[in-house]
Amino acid sequence: MKPSIHSLAHQTMQEWVLEQGEKKFRADQIWEWLYRKRVQSFEEMTNLSKDLIAKLNDQFVVNPLKQRIVQESADGTVKYLFELPDGMLIETVLMRQHYGLSVCVTTQVDCNIGCTFCASDLIKKQRDLNNGEIVAQIMLVQKYFAERGQDERVSHIVVMGIGEPFDNYNNVLNFVCTINDDKGMAIGARHITVSTSGLAHKIRNFADEGVQVNLAVSLHAPNNELRSSIMKINRAFPIEKLFAAIEYYIETTNRRVTFEYIMLNEVNDSVEQALELAELLKNIKKLSYVNLIPYNPVSEHDQYSRSPKERVLAFYDTLKKKGGNCVVRQEYGTDIDAACGQLRSNTMKRDRQKAVAEVNP
């Protein structure tokens, strides 16, 4: 299986063209075709020699993904189901924000974190995505717009799709560097957010990288007992260890951390739990921000339901009164398979039902 050309960082591309006996500037030309003109084949790179195009075709593919399903919401959200070269499926989501187009990318096939409310955790992790497969998601979103004559550019990236980004650390870091590169997509570092469920040692590593991207932490509970019951990762990295790493990150980078908090009715949404959360955040209040997220129900996790508006607002008001920075996050794609992993899960179920029907006509 040939790798995607998008797997190569710019410096690696320069090294590759030199190995082919070409001048270094050819790497700039290839990158311009890929990231500025967004071609989908090497043959479209008209200022390259036939010999170099043949070498590119022999060693790489441009885009390793196939578009399987697209769902468009009335609010402009678009959800994509892509097929990888090995037949596995991943999701990508485009959200229209007031500040631009934001794409949420997937980093793994399934997930090992063990969040009991998430459709992504229904199957254990099968593999990591490589850098090229993550970059390719954005390129196909851009292709989708180009085919419709829409001259819109992806401006923001959130690494919050299926999988734990810090469990695929090197590929995610390479991805961030690729999309941030001035010669590539040139997406500003502060327009990129990487999320983690709480791998404390990787948060420390990320602080030391010196990249200026944003960090989000999926918290979802204010104490160890509750967090361990809904997120098994907390058993390995309890809140004390997690917050020590977060404080190290803030001290090292002087950057704000966003906390994701999904609102589960009568599970984690009481006023008492809001007070616990405020206490947990008091030492980093000035450099923390809480996203209160309405829950998208998943049929496989019917023990959970969405918090009613009254409980969400009471939680919000309590945090605010304690000086916390928080917001109730806007919902996107409520009329499509909106929850993370839901489109993929539902598609796999339908494919399974078709197979059963074929076996038992």
From Swiss-Prot:
The active site is at E91, C340. The keyword Methyltransferase applies. SUPFAM superfamilies: Radical SAM enzymes (SSF102114). The keyword Signal does not apply. [4Fe-4S] cluster binds at C111, C115, C118. This is Probable dual-specificity RNA methyltransferase RlmN. Its cofactor is [4Fe-4S] cluster. It catalyses: adenosine(2503) in 23S rRNA + 2 reduced [2Fe-2S]-[ferredoxin] + 2 S-adenosyl-L-methionine = 2-methyladenosine(2503) in 23S rRNA + 5'-deoxyadenosine + L-methionine + 2 oxidized [2Fe-2S]-[ferredoxin] + S-adenosyl-L-homocysteine; adenosine(37) in tRNA + 2 reduced [2Fe-2S]-[ferredoxin] + 2 S-adenosyl-L-methionine = 2-methyladenosine(37) in tRNA + 5'-deoxyadenosine + L-methionine + 2 oxidized [2Fe-2S]-[ferredoxin] + S-adenosyl-L-homocysteine. The gene is rlmN. Belongs to the radical SAM superfamily. RlmN family.
